[in-house]
Structures are given as C-alpha cells and as structure tokens.
C-alpha cells in the first residue's frame, strides 16, 4: 500500500498563520500540510522563526490557524463543538515543554496523578513511575529533584493519561548533554511501549536520526518531509 493510501490518525491540511504588529505582517506558516500515523515519531526541525512551535501550538489547540484544517479520525476540529474540542485536547493530547511546569506543592506521584484524572484510560501510575526511573523519588517535591528528574516527572504527567499524540517542544533544551540523552532514551521507550504518536520540535539536528519521519521547516514552509530509512536508537545519538 502506498503511503498516501494509508489512513492517518491526524491530518494537517494547508495550514496558514500570520501575526500582525502594527503594519508589519509575519507569515509564520504558509500552506503547511502533514499526515501523522499512529505510533509515529515525527521530528520537526528548523531554525528559530521557522514556524516549528507555531505548528505544534496549532496541533495542540494553544493557537489557531488563519486558514486550513486539522482532521482527527476523519473529523475536522473546526466542526467540533467547544465541549468536544476541549475533551479532545484534554484526553487525547499530552504536552512536554522545555520548562517542566510542575505543581510545586505536589509530590512527584501527585503531579503525575493530576494527568491521570484527565483520562478515562489512564496508565498504571506505579508501572509508569518504574518506567520513568523515578519510583524511589515519588514522595519528593519538585524542588528536591534534579533537572532530569523534574523532566521525567513532566513526561509522566503528560503520558499517564495515555494520549494519542504527545507534543514535545524542545524537551531537552534546558538539560545538559548526558541528561538530554537519558530523556531522549526515555521518550523513545514511551513511544515503543505505549504506542503514542510523538511530535517533537527541536533545534537539535541529531534527533532526526531517531525519528520515523523528519520534517524540516524554513520561513513557515515545509522544505523537506521524508521517512527515515536509517533510524538509530537514541542511545547512539551524538552531537
């Protein structure tokens, strides 16, 4: 079966987005189309200002497109009621950001359980804590954790609700090299173990080597979009 004949979990169709400041107009996205499959790891790369984060925010409902459509399971998001759209974002999307945004007065376990409350199909918290390598830290508060442990907790909060799509915006940007490698290995494990589609925005060109699909943006347009035929494990990445 050809790629174009396959059914897609999410379709991004001719998305355009502009930002206006006075008389200045910046075209952030220009006719961007992209299809995502179940369990696909997609790396979106490009320089600052290329439109990477804008695209991620539109997929996640943080921002809206001026033109174009998002289609999930055959239904246009623009046609969904506000209630259904809110449920879609809350239950089917998970977010991992560069900064961890943990709730400071909740323990590691409680931060993750917040995500579980949002789902009707949550993962087992104990199993997830073991997968994340933070079971022994589950009673600690965020300020008692290292940066890597905080990011592991943030990943746990995002993944515990078992989202269809996990959106990652520079998830290792605030971490050192060794910790970054550990977090990328963890995200790879999450993708393989739980089958989520992962969309990762990054400046780190090396991450393309661990992705199933590589999308390169420049000036708001997709310049390259290809399947990675020589995928390597995160543990073998170097930069």
Enumerate the language-model features and the residues they cover.
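Short, Lys/Arg-enriched N-terminal segments with co-localized hydrophobic residues
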Residues: 2-7
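Conserved beta-strand-loop-alpha-helix hinge in the C-terminal portion
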Residues: 221-239
